[in-house]
Amino acid sequence: MQCNDVQATEPDIKVSLTRVGVTNLKKLVKLKRKNKRDIVLLPTFEVFVDLPSSQKGIHMSRSPEVIEEVVENILLEKEIYGVEDLSVEIVMKLFEKHEYATRAEIMLYSDYMMEEKSPVTQKDSQEIGKIIARAYGVKDENGKIAVKKMVGAEVVGITACPCAQNMLKENAVANLKEKGFSSEEIEKILDSVTIATHNQRGIGTVMIEVPNGYAVGISKIIKIIKNSMSGEVYELLKRSDEAFVVEAAHKNPKFVEDCAREMIKRVVDVFDYLPEDTQVLVRQVNKESIHRHDAFAERNSTIRELRDELKTLTN
């Protein structure tokens, strides 16, 4: 039985759409590693193509079909080592399947298991981060396709609010003065204790464009995010570990803006070999403990713009 191609008919309302596709598509993926065992991921895919005003719909089944083909066939035929390269393969295949499309995009999110040790007792545990990949392709009038790819990570940490901590410090100084302590004694006391403040669970995200011929290590991105907050979080903590984590975070208070700026500086320092027009996205979200809202900071820029700003500040 032959069915009419309803998707190829003209729509009642002739307006083009920028993104049509499928989301929340999960698939088991095995990525090769040089001289190491394969990495097994269970990523969630979002795949989109644009749709011209002359066509009623995309052929929706072709998008998950592309994922299936790339994961099952291309990964066996090619040596693909990164999620960003996997994303490029999917974008190119989307253009093959959706011949009417001039733009194609994929986003990939996956949990990423990391082995960690607690800071004091050195207990082994597994920590979960999130790796992200994005590829975006554009096809010109001559059929030439240009694809940009990005790779990144999302990591959870802890932040301590500097503002509340400063207020509590001022209150402590005033109370100690009332009780007759000298300025010298107060200074010694404050140096010996950790001043309280409210905390947030911070979520840091860094996405970096990967130009052709260059490599961007996800492990380096994860390290940058971890080191840009007040402290790290751990799945397994004994009492001495817990005391260490809390004290360390309170000795390193940061606003959401501080975390974003710290990530920016570290990205520029660590990835100084990337071309100047390399795109960088940095985002920090802090889940507030004493408010119902969250705090947010973001910067979307190029390596050159970020480097120039940092140079201006140091001169």
Swiss-Prot record:
Enzyme Commission number(s) of this protein: 3.5.4.39
Which species is listed as the source?
Answer: Methanococcus maripaludis (strain C5 / ATCC BAA-1333)
Which terms are listed as keywords in the entry? Hydrolase, Iron, Metal-binding
Which residue spans traverse the membrane?
Answer: none
Give the record's pathway.
Answer: Cofactor biosynthesis; 5,6,7,8-tetrahydromethanopterin biosynthesis
UniProt keyword annotation of Iron present: yes
Q: Does the keyword Iron apply?
A: yes
One short Pfam family name for this protein? Answer: GCHY-1
GO biological process terms on file: tetrahydromethanopterin biosynthetic process
Assembly and partners are described as: Homodimer.
Q: How is the cofactor bound?
A: Binds 1 Fe(2+) ion per subunit.
- Name assigned to this protein: GTP cyclohydrolase MptA
- Marked site (May be catalytically important) residue numbers: C161
User: What top-level class of enzyme does the UniProt entry assign?
Assistant: hydrolase
Molecular-function GO terms, alphabetical: GTP cyclohydrolase I activity; GTP cyclohydrolase IV activity; iron ion binding
Q: What does this protein do?
A: Converts GTP to 7,8-dihydro-D-neopterin 2',3'-cyclic phosphate, the first intermediate in the biosynthesis of coenzyme methanopterin.
Describe the reaction catalysed, as an equation: GTP + H2O = 7,8-dihydroneopterin 2',3'-cyclic phosphate + formate + diphosphate + H(+)
HAMAP family (UniProt xref): GTP_cyclohydrol_A
Task: State the needed cofactors, names only.
Answer: Fe(2+)
Source organism's superkingdom? Archaea
Give the family per the record: Belongs to the GTP cyclohydrolase IV family.
